[in-house]
Amino acid sequence: MSVRILVVDDDRAVRESLRRSLSFNGYTVELAHDGVEALEMIASDRPDALVLDVMMPRLDGLEVCRQLRSTGDDLPILVLTARDSVSERVAGLDAGADDYLPKPFALEELLARMRALLRRTKLEDDEAADSVAMTFSDLSLDPVTREVTRGARRISLTRTEFALLEMLIANPRRVLTRSRILEEVWGFDFPTSGNALEVYVGYLRRKTEAEGEPRLIHTVRGVGYVLRETPP
């Protein structure tokens, strides 16, 4: 059975372009023109993934993310943001989106990101049952319940943030190269240009240091990142 993707965008040309491209690549595609219609369709027949524009009438993409996440729905979500709007990307990740893609975008990149997102989702399902909670310092991550805590404080992470932190905590005090992280978290076909990794590391730091806790995720300049108690 093919993967079902719901594309939500108020621009008909964008919807049709994505429908053609995704269908050609073997996906079953459904379309919605705004957030209200999208939530109704998800409630009646849940898709496997969601491609979601941010700026839409009636109900925007950020509110769709928030409403889905508030009910505990972990539907994989790729949001489409304005090209130069850093604040929009920030808001999308904070609302619970798993990944973002700035407009205008190459269809090849959207397909690559969707493949990577679906791979991460499948790996979660396949591996969670065999996993045990992992800890480093006062940071704890449970792959089964998907709970993350720093001390007594619970931390809410998106799917991509969780996958990145899981990789770091599974390799404590070991420097992970940028290319290795991109390959394992995003997939081999993820475009290595751009600053997606840096964006996600920034968000992990913000969330894990929200109450003034010492930094655990450190940059190794020119190489990658490492999880350790003190800077390298």
From Swiss-Prot:
Transmembrane segments: none annotated. Phosphorylated and dephosphorylated by MprB. It is found in: Cytoplasm. Residues 4-118 form the Response regulatory domain. GO terms for cellular component: cytosol; protein-DNA complex. Residues 131-229 bind DNA. GO terms for biological process: regulation of DNA-templated transcription. InterPro entries: CheY-like_superfamily, OmpR/PhoB-type_DNA-bd, Sig_transdc_resp-reg_receiver, WalR-like, WH-like_DNA-bd_sf. Member of the two-component regulatory system MprB/MprA which contributes to maintaining a balance among several systems involved in stress resistance and is required for establishment and maintenance of persistent infection in the host. Functions as a transcriptional regulator that recognizes a 19-bp nucleotide motif comprizing two loosely conserved 8-bp direct DNA-binding motif repeats separated by a 3-bp spacer region. This is Response regulator MprA.
